[in-house]
């Protein structure tokens, strides 16, 4: 991976032949990198800091509305060394099986949602690359950032 995005306090690496798109509003920022085929990786920063579980549930509701055949599998992943609310899903679209991977975590500045997706035929070769993009994602962490679901008082026990 030779291209690097640095801006808005975040950094990630992505392949040179992928195309980067940025959309922003006062409430959120979305950065998406598209492969030459149909796979993509997307990061959305939600500045009103909604609960990560609500964010994942909202995305899952959208997938359920769009696809009639969908399987959802909970996952355990980290973003920027923080545990996330995570899941993977498989869905059928035009006789092809697609997969999407969702990760959400809340920080003191935003809730981050990573979503990457592709057709199974592409993911045989691109899933590792999509995971490397996710693994390269970094932002300045605040000492107040907590893992989801763990109250602050657990730090003193």
Model-derived segments and their meaning:
Residues 12, 41, 98-100, 112:
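Short beta-strand segments
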Residues 39-41, 84, 109-113:
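Glycine-rich, often proline-containing surface loops adjacent to acidic residues and nearby aromatics
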Residues 1-3, 114-115:
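Short, compositionally biased strand/turn segments
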Residues 18, 113-157:
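Surface-exposed amphipathic alpha-helical segments
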Residues 2-61:
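Secretory pathway targeting signatures of secreted, lumenal, and periplasmic proteins
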